[in-house]
Every structure is written in C-alpha cells, then in structure tokens.
Amino acid sequence: VRYNVIRWVSSAYPSYGAIGPSFANPRTGQILGSDITIEWYSGSSTPTMDELFSFKNEGASEAINAHFHNDGTACTLANELKSQFLMGTTFAEVNSEDPKTISRAHKEFLYYLVLHEMGHTLGLNHNMKSSQMLSPTDLHNTAITEKIGLIGSVMDYPAINLATDKTKQGNFYTTKPGPYDLWAIEFGYKEFDEKTEEAELQKILSRSTDPNLAFGNDADDMRSPGKAIDPRVMVNDLSSDAIGNAEERFKIVNSIMPKLKGKYSKNGESYAELRSRFNMLNGQRRNMAAVVSRYVGGVFIDRSFVGQNSTVKPFTPVSKVQQKRAIEVLNKY
C-alpha cells in the first residue's frame, strides 16, 4: 500500500509479458495500491523465445496463467507489442537505419507498455477501437501526435507506426494518455459536490459521441474469428483507414523478407535468430490479414443513447466499396 512501483524482472515465466494488477477495498471499490511488473524479454529487443519456456505452467501464479486462457481480465499486450516492435527494428536494421532511431523506437515502445499497464492499475478497460482516431495523413505529424497521441487510448493493442519513407517517420508509439483515457479518468476520479455530482457526471458522459473518445473493449473486439461484428474494434491495426495501413505494412514485410538471410545468417552460428525473425514477420502477415478480413461482412456499431441526437445509425454494414477493397488487398498479399 505504501509504495507503488514498476518492477523489471527476469522470471521463470518470461512469456507472460507484463502485468499491472491492483487491489481494491472490497467495500467501496477504491483502488488501494498497485504495481507494474515487466518481464525482461518483453521489454528487450531480443527476438528469440526459448522453447523451454512453456505458455502455461502449474507453478505460475493465477495472474500469469490468466494470460493464456482467454480470461476476460487477461492482458497480452506485451507479447503483441513485442512482435510489432521487432518488425520495426528488423525493418530498421536491414535498411541500416541510424542506431539512434532504433533506440528512440525502443524507448517509445517501453513508454507505451508502461502507460498501458498503468491504465490497468487505475481500473481502465481495454479500448480496441481507439487506434482509429487519426487519419493516415496525420500518423506521422508529430505536431498532432505529441499533443494528443497517436491513438485515443493507451489501452489499445495498436500496430507499430512505421513509415515506408524513413524521412517521414514520426512517433513509433504514442507516449502520452489519449483523449479517451483523460475522459475516463475524469469520470472515475474527479470529485464533485454531493448536490451537483449527478449533473456533473452526466455532463462528462454526454461527450461520448466525440470520435476521439471512441470505445470498444474485449467484449466487442474481433481478434478471434466468429466473435463480434465491428471491424474497427480490433487489435494490431492503426488509423481511420485500417485496410490501407495494413497494406502499407504488407509492403514493408515484403521488402524485408529478401534481406533477412544476408542480415541474420552468421558463420559459425545457428539459424535461430533468422528463423525467429522469419516467423515473426509471417506472424505479422497473419495479423494484417486478420485486420483486413474483418471488414468483409462487418457491421459498424454505434451505441449512442436516446437523446444524444447522433446522426449515425446503431448498425451500419461496411460499404460494398470497403468490402471489395479488403478482398482485393487479401488477394494481392
């Protein structure tokens, strides 16, 4: 209770990634304390996970095992983020990028990981819709991203922000709480006079139709086939044009693949790192294909309340143009 800290650990279960558990007063729900733990593997640029480490261990804590059981409270961001980060560093390394740029990417990666877990310590839900906040043209505009962030909430599982033209590279990850985070924290933590509290809370809630405050948690995300219907509530995506962003990342992966063997094959050493990088990039292809495929047959959901005068219908099928575009991207890559 006295100290709330961030622990950097090297444990027997590196696959758990990172956690930000908290404990609360059972009578009031008030959060009394919390700690963030980051496993060295998740926070490092090391690409290889030793096969000796299983993804479930009877000796591991309940919190760690929750990560591998589709538990509603589980958070697998560290592993998702690590794969995205390795894609970015591999892209930089095969193109002989300035080490300072790679260092900046690593720093932003760690910032984001800690911010996400800190959000959990404050009681925030995952928000897998917030990565839709910015348009593709704004993603690398640091005048915007350093003011309000790359995404609406640090509680998302976003794709790394990579520019195909390195001279235009902006932030790789958001490094500050987004508009949704600030809004949710204001609702949950701001103190009001007892007489005005209800009216003030309703005033905060009335802003829910602001596009920058878009929300969709684990119950609505489409990471698993056959689950949910709104393709905007998805992991490993980025920007208001998730299809276009995925296509850009397909191009990046395809540009990396021919250079892998020359970069990561070393005389007298095993193929472990080459294999790991190759598998990681194929995993990214799978993620991008998943993002694009969700637009085929998808339905956009709007949960505005009666009286909010929303101009958006509760259910809007993804347009024929978008669905056709998604299929074309899948066929091409």
Regions found by a protein language model. Give the residues of each.
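Metzincin-family zinc-dependent endopeptidase catalytic domain
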Residues: 1-121, 149-150, 160-163, 185
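Short linear motifs at secondary-structure transitions and domain/linker junctions
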Residues: 8-14, 129-133, 316
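Poly-acidic low-complexity segments
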Residues: 25, 39-41, 111, 127, ...
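Alpha-helix termini
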Residues: 42, 46, 129-132, 136
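Conserved catalytic/binding loops enriched for acidic/polar residues
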Residues: 93, 101, 105, 131-333
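Catalytic Zn2+-binding segment of zinc metalloproteases
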Residues: 118-134
